[in-house]
A protein has these predicted regions:
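Short, well-ordered amphipathic alpha-helices
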Residues: 15-22, 79-84, 111-115
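Acidic-enriched, low-complexity/disordered segments with a strong bias for Aspartate over Glutamate
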Residues: 28, 109-113, 131, 147
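C-terminal accessory regions of radical SAM enzymes
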Residues: 119-171
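Acidic (Asp/Glu)-rich catalytic clusters
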Residues: 22-23, 46-53, 87, 115-118
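Catalytic cores of alpha/beta
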Residues: 101-117
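Core AdoMet radical
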Residues: 1-13, 25-42, 49-80, 92-101, ...
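Distinct, well-ordered alpha-helical segments
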Residues: 14-20, 42-48, 106-110
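Short secondary-structure boundary/capping segments
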Residues: 18-19, 71-75, 109-114, 140-141
Length: 171
């Protein structure tokens, strides 16, 4: 297994050489890529689509303007476009979310949007941000926390409970 992370791994020019080496020397090797999908060029995409075992770990947790703010200089429209591309491949995709005060409520809309666009409910991993403390959702007022809990409870009623995060990172 090779794990590419960043910052943004597609900004690292040497990673394209590594992908070419994998393709040439061991195309059955598992390649894990942790990316925000902001720099998926046609050249990189064309190289990766020839590999059999790729696990895309996509960092995102909010929609539209909120995504653009949190993941600046990323753009939600670019994420959607690139996600649509990689969904066409026979690769595994996991959405790795950081649940923080900036997306406390919007993360629920994000999950809905991703599911409506073809992702499976089991493709999400939510990481609670506790540090730095000012980004933690524990800073929400009591009323906002109650409202958030209510929204989560409502969402849970609409989810088929057979879906749960089980072996999401395993191949």
């Amino acid at each position: 297994t090779i794990y590419m992370a960043g910052g943004e791994p597609f900004l690292i020019k040497e990673n394209l050489k590594i992908i070419e080496l994998i393709k040439k020397e061991n195309p059955d090797l598992l390649l894990r890529i942790n990316t925000n999908l902001s720099n998926l060029t046609p050249k990189i995409y064309n190289q990766l689509k020839t590999l059999k075992k790729v696990h895309w770990i996509v960092s995102a947790e909010s929609t539209e303007a909120r995504f653009n703010y949190i993941r600046w200089p990323g753009e939600y429209s670019v994420l959607q476009k690139n996600l649509k591309l990689i969904k066409q491949l026979p690769h595994k995709i996991t959405i790795n979310m950081t649940w923080n005060i900036l997306c406390a409520f919007n993360i629920l809309d994000f999950i809905d949007d991703m599911i409506q666009n073809g992702l499976h409910p089991n493709q999400f991993v939510m990481n609670y941000v506790s540090d730095p403390i000012f980004q933690s959702i524990s800073n929400l007022s009591e009323n906002l926390r109650k409202d958030l809990i209510s929204k989560i409870e409502q969402k849970k009623k609409n989810i088929n409970n057979k879906f749960y995060l089980y072996k999401v990172y395993e191949e």
